[in-house]
Amino acid sequence: GTSKQYISQIIDSNDIPSLGESMLIASPTGSGKTSAVIKMIKHTSMPVIYVTNRKMTLCQFKKDYIKASKGLDVPAELLDSISLGENIIAITYQELAETTYKYKGKKYLLILDEVHCLLEDANFSVYAEKIIRYLKANRDNTARIYLTATPDAVTPVIAEIECESGQEQALF
């Protein structure tokens, strides 16, 4: 049989979108999307905002990031007390919605993990609407990486966010 291929084997860690550009990484759960993104974070000089839907996913990202960047295996109960570094913020979509004013007009690499969860909530959630408005208003000063295991539900909304900017999307 064929061996399983991971996203980090396909996407080079230098394939980071530039300001005003975006990338959609759509692949199954367990294919290494987070590992690939962690490698990208380590290779970028841009400040990073990693956003996801749940505290559990956020804790797992922090744990994986600290292990990959510092070689430490941190117990979950200590994750909140350990800094990821001055150049990286890891928050939930709800936290981003409540604090978009802090990031308006600033240059960031935005990593939107489990983006299907945000966009599925878009019709009945004020915070999803607020984030979509933020993304549209800050296209030129941010680079965006969208991560999902279920692209069919989100591709039209991502296209709506991105295509007004006149930038082409790289779809993986």
Labelled PLM ranges:
Residues G1-F172:
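N-terminal helicase ATP-binding lobe
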